[in-house]
C-alpha cells in the first residue's frame, strides 16, 4: 500500500501539471472502487484546479466549489500523460486538462477512492486523524504522552492514524530499526529519550524516502511513471533471513495485526 512518502511523491509529481490548469472533463471507465466514484466527479467540466494538497494518505484537489479526495488504496497510482495513450485494463479514471495533460489513475485492485466534498472539515475519511509526522506537533514529548499508558506493542501503535498519520508498515519497521527499538516492546515501556529519538528518526526516514521518490515494491510509480528508489535503502523491511547491514545477524520477521514486521534481534532492544 502506498504510504505517506509515496502519496507525497505523487502530490509533488502532479501538482505542476494541474494547478493553474482547468479540468475539461473527467473520463470514468470504472467507477466501482472501494467506494463508488462521486457523481460530482462525473460532471466535472471547465473546472480550474486551485491547489493539490495532502492529508495523511489522501490527495486533495482544491476546486472553486469543493474538493476531490483521492486515496490510492492498496495498488493505485497516478501518472501525468502528455498525450491520450490508449487505456489499459486497470486505468479507471482520467482527468483531461486544458494544458494538454491527462491525469490517469490506475488501480489493479480497485481499493482506492475518488470522492467529492463541499468542505473538508468534518468529512468522515479525514476526521479523527492524528498529526502529520513531519509537523512540529509530532515530537518526542507528544509521542511520550501518547505512549505512556498504551499497553500495546509499539509497532502497531505507530501505524494507528489516531497517533500519527502516514507511518505505514514499511516505515514503521524501518524507523524502529533506526531507533534501535524492538517492535514487540510495549509502547508504555519507551523512555523519554527513546520517544524523542523515535520521533526524530520517523521524520528522517520519511524525508529520505520522499527524496528518493518513495518505495517501489510492486505497483507504485511516481507521477512521471518512474519507480521510487527508497527500496534500495531498506534496512529490514522485506529482508527476512538476509544479514543485517549493521551487525550481520539474519533479519527476523513476525506479525502484528496480520501485518509483517521485520527487525534485527541484535540491534533492536
UniProtKB/Swiss-Prot annotation:
Keywords: DNA damage, DNA repair, DNA-binding, Glycosidase, Hydrolase, Lyase, Metal-binding, Multifunctional enzyme, Zinc, Zinc-finger
Co-factor binding comment: Binds 1 zinc ion per subunit.
The keyword Zinc-finger belongs to this UniProt entry's keyword annotation: yes
GO molecular function, one term: class I DNA-(apurinic or apyrimidinic site) endonuclease activity
Cofactor: Zn(2+)
Top-level taxonomic group: Bacteria
Reaction it catalyzes: Hydrolysis of DNA containing ring-opened 7-methylguanine residues, releasing 2,6-diamino-4-hydroxy-5-(N-methyl)formamidopyrimidine; 2'-deoxyribonucleotide-(2'-deoxyribose 5'-phosphate)-2'-deoxyribonucleotide-DNA = a 3'-end 2'-deoxyribonucleotide-(2,3-dehydro-2,3-deoxyribose 5'-phosphate)-DNA + a 5'-end 5'-phospho-2'-deoxyribonucleoside-DNA + H(+)
Keyword DNA-binding on entry: yes
Residues where DNA binds: 90, 109, 150
Stated role: Involved in base excision repair of DNA damaged by oxidation or by mutagenic agents. Acts as a DNA glycosylase that recognizes and removes damaged bases. Has a preference for oxidized purines, such as 7,8-dihydro-8-oxoguanine (8-oxoG). Has AP (apurinic/apyrimidinic) lyase activity and introduces nicks in the DNA strand. Cleaves the DNA backbone by beta-delta elimination to generate a single-strand break at the site of the removed base with both 3'- and 5'-phosphates.
Protein name: Formamidopyrimidine-DNA glycosylase
Organism: Salmonella paratyphi B (strain ATCC BAA-1250 / SPB7)
Amino acid at each position: 500500500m502506498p504510504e505517506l512518502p509515496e502519496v507525497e511523491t505523487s502530490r509533488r509529481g502532479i501538482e505542476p501539471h494541474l494547478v493553474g490548469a482547468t479540468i475539461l472533463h473527467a473520463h470514468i471507465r470504472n467507477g466501482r472502487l472501494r467506494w463508488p466514484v462521486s457523481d460530482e466527479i462525473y460532471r466535472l467540466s471547465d473546472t480550474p484546479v486551485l491547489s493539490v494538497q495532502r492529508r495523511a494518505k489522501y490527495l486533495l484537489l482544491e476546486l472553486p466549489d469543493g474538493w476531490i479526495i483521492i486515496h490510492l488504496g492498496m495498488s493505485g497510482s497516478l501518472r501525468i500523460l502528455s498525450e491520450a495513450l490508449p487505456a489499459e485494463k486497470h486505468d479507471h479514471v482520467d482527468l483531461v486538462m486544458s494544458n494538454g495533460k491527462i491525469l490517469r489513475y490506475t488501480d489493479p485492485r480497485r481499493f482506492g477512492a475518488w470522492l467529492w466534498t463541499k468542505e473538508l472539515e468534518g468529512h468522515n475519511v479525514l476526521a479523527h486523524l492524528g498529526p502529520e509526522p513531519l509537523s512540529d506537533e509530532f515530537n518526542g514529548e507528544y509521542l511520550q504522552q501518547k505512549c505512556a499508558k498504551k499497553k500495546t506493542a509499539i509497532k502497531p501503535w505507530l501505524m494507528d492514524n489516531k497517533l500519527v498519520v502516514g507511518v505505514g508498515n514499511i516505515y514503521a519497521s524501518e524507523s524502529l530499526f533506526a531507533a534501535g527499538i524492538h517492535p514487540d516492546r510495549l509502547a508504555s515501556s519507551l523512555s523519554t529519550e527513546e520517544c524523542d529519538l523515535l520521533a526524530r528518526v520517523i521524520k528522517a526516514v520519511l524525508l529520505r524516502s520522499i527524496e528518493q521518490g518513495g518505495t517501489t515494491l510492486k505497483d507504485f510509480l511516481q507521477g512521471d511513471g518512474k519507480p521510487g528508489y527508497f527500496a534500495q535503502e531498506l534496512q529490514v523491511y522485506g529482508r527476512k533471513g538476509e544479514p543485517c547491514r549493521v551487525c550481520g545477524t539474519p533479519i527476523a520477521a513476525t506479525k502484528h495485526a496480520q501485518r509483517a514486521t521485520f527487525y534485527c534481534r541484535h540491534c533492536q532492544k
